[in-house]
Amino acid sequence: MSYLAQITSPTLVLSERITRNNLQRMAIKAKTHGKKLVPHWKTSQSKEVGRWAREYGITEITCSSIKMAEYLSQEGWERIHIAFPFNVRELPKLNQLALQQRMSVQVVNPVTATLLARELKAPIDFFIEIDAGYGRTGVQFSDTATIDSILSIASGCSHLQFRGFYLHPGHTYYGKDNFKIHQESRNALKSLKDRYNILYPKLLTRLGDTPGCAVVEDFGEVDELGPGNFVFFDLMQVALGSCRKEDIALCLAVPVVDIQHSRKEILIHGGGVHLAKDVLVQADGSKNFGEIVLLHDQGWTIPKHYSYVKSISQEHGIIQASEELLASVQVGDLLG
C-alpha cells in the first residue's frame, strides 16, 4: 500500500536522500576546513537520523535540554552537549545522566559554576557561552573578570572540567551581514583563546549557526562548528541564502478539507500546532507560512506554479492557490 494512502491527518514526511545529502555536505565542508562538526540536534531530534549522521564521521552532538539529552543518550555518542545556560534545578538529572553518557553543559555565571562544583557526583565538561553581539545570553567576550571567576570556581572541583568557549551568533537569522557577524565572532573567540590558551592548552572554541556555517568559507582558528538547521533546512534558510528549496528535507502532508474557487483558497487540516508559527513576509507584505509541494510515493515535487499557506490558526491552514493547483486538487486529497 502507498504510504500516502495511510495518511489521514497532518503527517511529517522526511526525505532520507535529501537529509543524507545535507549531512554529508556539511561534514565534507567541516573536514575540508579542518574543523570538527558537532551539530545541534534540537531540530532533528531523531535517533535514526543520528545513526545516519555517524556514517559521515559525526561523533558528538548538541541538544537544548536534559530531556532531549536523555532521549539521545546510549546511542553511541562520544559526548552530548546541552547548548543552553545550565538550569541548576536539573542538577540531580544531570548527575544521573552523566553516569551513563559523557556530557558537557553551558555556564554563563559564577553562581551556576558554584552549584555545579558543589553538587556534581560525576565528571562533567563545560563550555563558557560567549556573547559577541547577539545579546540573548552569554558572558560578554570582554568580561574577563566573570570568565576568570567561573574558571577559578571550576578549578577547585575535579568533576568540573573546562572544555572551551561556545558562541552562537544567532543574529545571522535576522538577515544582517553574516560575513561581518562571523568575522566578529571569530575575532572574539580568537582573543579569548589567545588569553587563556597558556593555562588551558586543550581549550576548544565552537561556533554554531546554520546561516553562517552554510555560506562562510573562512572559519579562522575556530576548532568546531555547531550548526543545526542544516540537517533538514527550511524556507527561512532559503530566504537567508543558506540553501536551495531542493535542499529542504521535510514537508508536512496535510488533508484538503474545503476549496473556495472564488477566493482561490484551499482549506487544509494543518495549522500552528503542526507547522509552528514561523513566518516569512513576502515582498507585497503578505505572510507565508509554507509553500506547497506535490506529494508522490517517492517524496514530493516542487511545482512551477506558486501556492503558499497565507494564514494559520491552531488546526486550520488556508492556502492561497494558483490556478493550476485549484484545477488539480479535490477535497480529500493530500498536499505537502
Regions found by a protein language model. Name each.
Residues 123, 132-244:
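Active-site loop/helix belt of alpha/beta enzymes
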Residues 19, 42, 72, 128, ...:
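Conserved, mostly hydrophobic/aromatic
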Residues 213-295:
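Active-site loop ensemble at the mouth of alpha/beta enzyme cores that anchors a bound cofactor
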Residues 1-14:
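Generic N-terminal amphipathic, Lys/Arg-enriched alpha-helix
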Residues 23-32, 39, 47, 56, ...:
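Alpha-helix-loop-beta-strand connector modules within alpha/beta enzyme cores
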Residues 38-175:
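Active-site-proximal beta-alpha core segment in soluble small-molecule metabolic enzymes
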Residues 263-336:
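C-terminal accessory subdomain/extension
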Residues 11, 20, 27:
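Expand to "…catalyze enediolate/carbanion chemistry for C-C bond making/breaking, isomerization
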